[in-house]
């Protein structure tokens, strides 16, 4: 085995780190890097005075060697017994694996190691490493420990620039395939700036990028009590002053820093109050002793006689430190295991024998029990609930864990977990408001709801830890990690330029190549941008930084105040807009996806909308999704976000034509270094020089052609109002709430102006109608928890033109309601029956109203909210009393008025239908005549006279002798007087004698008949 002298600077760096309690970072380039881990660990073991440092070994899938420790130990013991162990010849790596406490961990299971501490961390499979994983693992290493990153053999570190990372496959979409590895480039360049970082090859030769260690010198040995800081002296004084106050004194004695001691005192103050209504929130960066402070506080709660103590965290594995300090507290309080308490460990192999229960039976039965964050229902008898790593628990679960008991919570706020800001921004903000409300006296506005709110109000105490315990202050690796991942941008700079008018501000395009080049000026600008991101958004993880730098479809814009021409410094940033270009998916891909139910990564809006509406054409449109609009916290709500959005829309509508003749071409691929050009040991890595300007005006860059702008966000009333005001229309609302925030994802779209604008807007109007119909149906299911105000805000949208719907007809009415139903409604409208009698009809009425099928029926906002709450969300009047904030009597009055209006409308519909069925009366159209009345009468008289003459002429030609009535008046008078009143027949003597010829008989009979008839007529006249 060839032996080689190790560079002395490596040993000095490790020993200095141990002496200063600061971590060191080693990047080992080469396939045999794992063999050098043994040497580095050996140096660390010699430098530290305590036991062999434990190791955390993280990998993707394949470890590359057997991790079976027992098997290796048996083999080793056999060799020792047989005397065949040769330390010079045997593989030192085998010995290292057998004799060291190594925790092997897949990258996708690193959440289980939160809260644990290791002496050394090894990260292999660099391509699987993400910023989140880097932050999570590096922060578990204690002061004096080592972080070792293993890279494969390469000729140049610049090969890492073009290395394909596993996460890149998620950034590629059908339309955007070319990923540029800006994050890796910045990562490598940042290594040169870290004073405690060494980049070495697998022969332990130091590479030129780490030239800063050329002058490293060993630190002189220091006495332990030398140079105590003022904080350490204050801590000693505090411990001495509390010696006589027990059990507080012994617990504070276990604290390492002044911050931690003050936190423990605050916890014990909450315990001793025993109001069970206060929340103590402890926030700090990693490695500040949060879990230890909680553990000591739990020991204090047991000493104060608390019986039911529950502890929760994402996994029992995260509670190693907490329980370790519970037992340290017990030792200080002179509790003895088995005599005073017993420990129950988990048998679940996933939890790695974690402590899940402690039974204390010194004075009376007391328990400390681990529960899963989702099991808040089991907290019925709790007196104290402790939430560790609250930042890693979804926000809705943390809210459900708060109740009528004392709550201690600890949270990491550096944003490494992704939800750290969520907890500090949202939850603690809400607790602050509740706490403030409890101080205010009740008003007479609505005493019932105010009293209920005050009953649940809690007092909030906030504690933060600044001083690090896991490693000494000023740790170089912590500073490097914070700068690399922009974790430490919580302190946002105040803008000194005043409030410019939003109309005067301009939007600029940010060149990402320049932004992530690790130049000093661009680093300052990047930190400013990320500070805005962190301060104005609920969820911000380091992975977002990698997506921003590497994803090909993402673009950055920033809103800047008017910049005077003489200004040399970088301007203040008012707002940042991140846009992701989506769409342009081939129809075939969408059809395949719809038929198989599979979606590719990326293209969030096209895939979701295509699936929701089963529309294969939508994915072909090109759109821009606004990923974030982050506005400076001092300027929120002043119109800067709306201005940025307005300018962005104008840019993509082509209203800023590109005036540049030669557009700045950014090289798509990075120049690779040939292996002959320079060796790894001679290569000098520096930031690139030939970079385009950081900021471009919108008319200096041609815009991509887009059909629509879209946004997907967690639905809140404020955000909905903002996007509606910007002209966006909701088309999708996810039915299940987001695990992290408890909010429902909402997708809203807006078409961009084009020549055929009417046709453009038609598909959006169709989507909106379909969405509204579905949303109304789902209001009684997943969306029943929404407040009526929020639901109304979603349904009412003026950004889509109202289409004229057919009025409600009698057939439709009869299909929905029986005559008896209408009778019931009428009876209620007259206050003759109770409202329970018509509750079954309200859903149908609500649906008709909100689908605009009730014609001109108009309701006030309160009436609409009431109708929606009762009819579509199926809420009780008591619930609505709290949500609408009106007394129930007033609500019932409003409800009766709604039904009256509806009954009147239904009656009108029926009356109209009956009118249409009745016989139609002919309408006489009165028009002025052409002739005067006298002319008209003269003409009619002439016509009559002519007609009369013709008829008289006809009569003259006919023989009328047979119709002549014989006799004169005297004869008739005589005959009639003789006959009397009741006579039916009278006879008059004729002058002619009757002819007796047989031939004339028929004629005679006819004549007689006629005569008889004539006589009858005469008789009738007489009667009259």
From Swiss-Prot:
Residue numbers carrying Phosphothreonine: 716
Entry keywords, A to Z: Acetylation, Acyltransferase, ATP-binding, Nucleotide-binding, Nucleus, Phosphoprotein, rRNA processing, Transferase, tRNA processing
Catalytic activity: a cytidine in 18S rRNA + acetyl-CoA + ATP + H2O = an N(4)-acetylcytidine in 18S rRNA + ADP + phosphate + CoA + H(+); a cytidine in tRNA + acetyl-CoA + ATP + H2O = an N(4)-acetylcytidine in tRNA + ADP + phosphate + CoA + H(+); a cytidine in mRNA + acetyl-CoA + ATP + H2O = an N(4)-acetylcytidine in mRNA + ADP + phosphate + CoA + H(+)
GO CC aspect terms: midbody; nucleolus; small-subunit processome; telomerase holoenzyme complex
Record PANTHER family: N-ACETYLTRANSFERASE 10 (PTHR10925), RNA CYTIDINE ACETYLTRANSFERASE (PTHR10925:SF5)
Subunit text: Part of the small subunit (SSU) processome, composed of more than 70 proteins and the RNA chaperone small nucleolar RNA (snoRNA) U3. Interacts with THUMPD1. Interacts with SUN1 (via N-terminus). Interacts with TERT.
Protein family membership: Belongs to the RNA cytidine acetyltransferase family. NAT10 subfamily.
Name of this protein: RNA cytidine acetyltransferase
Taxon lineage: Eukaryota, Metazoa, Chordata, Craniata, Vertebrata
């Amino acid at each position: 085995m060839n032996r080689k002298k190790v560079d002395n600077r490596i040993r000095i760096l490790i020993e200095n780190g141990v002496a200063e309690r600061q971590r060191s970072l080693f990047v080992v380039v080469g396939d045999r890097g794992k063999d050098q881990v043994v040497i580095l660990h050996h140096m660390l073991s010699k430098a530290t005075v305590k036991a062999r440092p434990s190791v955390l070994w993280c990998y993707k899938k394949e470890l590359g060697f057997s991790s079976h420790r027992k098997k290796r130990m048996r083999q080793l013991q056999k060799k020792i017994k047989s005397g065949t162990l040769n330390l010079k010849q045997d593989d030192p790596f085998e010995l290292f694996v057998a004799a060291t406490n190594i925790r092997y961990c897949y990258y996708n299971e690193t959440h289980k190691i939160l809260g644990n501490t290791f002496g050394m961390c090894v990260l292999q499979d660099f391509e699987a490493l993400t910023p989140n994983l880097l932050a999570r693992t590096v922060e578990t290493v204690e002061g004096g420990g080592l972080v070792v990153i293993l890279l494969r053999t390469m000729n140049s570190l610049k090969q890492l620039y073009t290395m394909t990372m596993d996460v890149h496959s998620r950034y590629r979409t059908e339309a955007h395939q070319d990923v540029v590895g800006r994050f890796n480039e910045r990562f490598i360049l940042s290594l040169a700036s870290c004073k405690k970082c060494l980049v070495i090859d697998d022969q332990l030769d130091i590479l030129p990028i780490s030239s800063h260690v050329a002058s490293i010198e060993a630190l002189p040995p220091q006495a332990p009590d030398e140079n105590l800081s003022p904080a350490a002296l204050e801590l000693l004084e505090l411990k001495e002053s509390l010696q006589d106050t027990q059990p507080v004194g012994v617990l504070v004695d276990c604290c390492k820093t002044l911050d931690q001691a003050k936190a423990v005192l605050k916890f014990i103050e909450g315990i001793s109050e025993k109001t069970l209504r206060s929340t103590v929130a402890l926030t700090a960066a990693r490695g500040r002793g949060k879990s230890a402070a909680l553990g000591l506080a739990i020991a204090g709660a047991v000493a104060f006689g608390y019986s039911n103590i529950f502890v929760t965290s994402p996994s029992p594995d995260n509670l190693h430190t907490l329980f370790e300090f519970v037992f340290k507290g017990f030792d200080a309080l002179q509790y003895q295991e088995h005599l005073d308490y017993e420990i129950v460990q988990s048998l679940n192999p996933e939890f790695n024998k974690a402590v899940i229960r402690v039974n204390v039976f010194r004075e009376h039965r007391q328990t400390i029990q681990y529960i899963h964050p989702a099991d808040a229902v089991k907290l019925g008898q709790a007196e104290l609930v402790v939430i560790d790593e609250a930042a890693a628990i979804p926000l809705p679960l943390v809210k459900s864990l708060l109740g009528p008991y004392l709550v201690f919570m600890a949270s990491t706020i550096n944003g490494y977990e992704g939800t750290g800001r969520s907890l500090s921004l949202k939850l603690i903000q809400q607790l602050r408001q509740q706490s403030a409300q409890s101080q205010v006296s009740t008003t007479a506005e609505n005493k019932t709801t105010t009293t209920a709110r005050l009953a649940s109000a809690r007092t909030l105490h906030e504690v933060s830890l600044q001083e690090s315990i896991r490693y000494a202050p000023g740790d170089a690796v912590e500073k490097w990690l914070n700068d690399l991942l922009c974790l430490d941008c919580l302190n946002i700079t105040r803008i000194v330029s005043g409030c410019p008018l939003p109309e005067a501000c301009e939007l600029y395009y940010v060149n990402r190549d320049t932004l992530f080049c690790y130049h000093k000026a661009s680093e300052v600008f990047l930190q400013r941008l990320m500070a805005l991101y962190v301060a104005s958004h609920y969820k911000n993880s380091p992975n977002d930084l990698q997506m921003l730098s590497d994803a090909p479809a993402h673009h950055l814009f920033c809103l800047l105040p008017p910049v005077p021409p003489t200004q040399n410094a970088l301007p203040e940033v008012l707002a940042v807009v991140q846009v992701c270009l989506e769409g342009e998916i081939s129809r075939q891909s969408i059809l395949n996806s719809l038929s198989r139910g599979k979606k590719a990564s990326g293209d969030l809006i096209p895939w979701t909308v295509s699936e929701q509406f089963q529309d294969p054409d939508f994915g072909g449109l090109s759109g821009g999704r606004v990923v974030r609009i982050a506005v400076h916290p001092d300027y929120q709500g002043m119109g800067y976000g709306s201005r940025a959005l307005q300018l962005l829309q104008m840019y993509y509508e082509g209203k800023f034509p590109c005036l540049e003749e030669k557009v700045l071409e950014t090289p798509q691929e990075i120049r690779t270094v040939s292996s002959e050009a320079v060796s790894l040991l001679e290569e000098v890595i520096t930031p690139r020089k030939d970079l385009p300007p950081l900021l471009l005006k919108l008319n200096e860059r041609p815009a991509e052609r887009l059909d629509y702008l879209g946004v997907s966000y967690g639905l809140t009333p404020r955000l909905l109002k903002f996007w509606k005001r910007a002209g966006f229309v909701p088309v999708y609302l996810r039915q299940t709430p987001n695990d992290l925030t408890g909010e429902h994802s909402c997708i809203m779209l807006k078409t961009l102006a084009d020549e055929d604008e009417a046709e453009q807007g038609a598909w959006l109007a169709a989507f909106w109608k379909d969405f509204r119909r579905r949303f109304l149906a789902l209001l009684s299911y997943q969306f029943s928890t929404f407040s009526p105000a929020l639901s109304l805000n979603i349904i009412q949208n003026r950004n889509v033109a109202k289409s004229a719907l057919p009025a409600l007809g009698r057939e439709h009415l009869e299909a929905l309601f029986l005559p008896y139903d209408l009778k019931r409604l009428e009876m209620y409208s007259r206050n003759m029956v109770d409202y329970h009698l018509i509750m079954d009809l309200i859903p149908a009425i609500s649906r008709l109203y909100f689908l605009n099928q009730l014609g001109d029926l108009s309701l006030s906002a309160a009436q609409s909210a009431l109708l929606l709450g009762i009819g579509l969300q199926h809420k009780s009047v008591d619930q609505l009393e709290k949500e609408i904030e009106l007394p129930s009597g007033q609500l019932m009055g409003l409800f009766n008025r709604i039904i009256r209006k509806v009954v009147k409308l239904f009656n009108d519909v029926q009356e109209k239908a009956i009118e249409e069925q009745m016989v139609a009366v002919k309408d006489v159209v009165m028009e002025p005549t052409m002739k005067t009345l006298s002319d008209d009468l003269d003409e009619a008289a002439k016509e009559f006279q002519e007609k009369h003459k013709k008829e008289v002429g006809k009569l003259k030609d006919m023989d009328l002798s047979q119709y002549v009535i014989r006799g004169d008046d005297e004869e008739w008078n005589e005959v009639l007087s003789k006959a009397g009143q009741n006579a039916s027949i009278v006879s008059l003597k004729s002058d002619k004698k009757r002819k007796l010829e047989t031939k004339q008989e028929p004629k005679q009979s006819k004549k007689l008949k006629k005569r008889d008839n004539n006589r009858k007529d005469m008789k009738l006249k007489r009667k009259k």
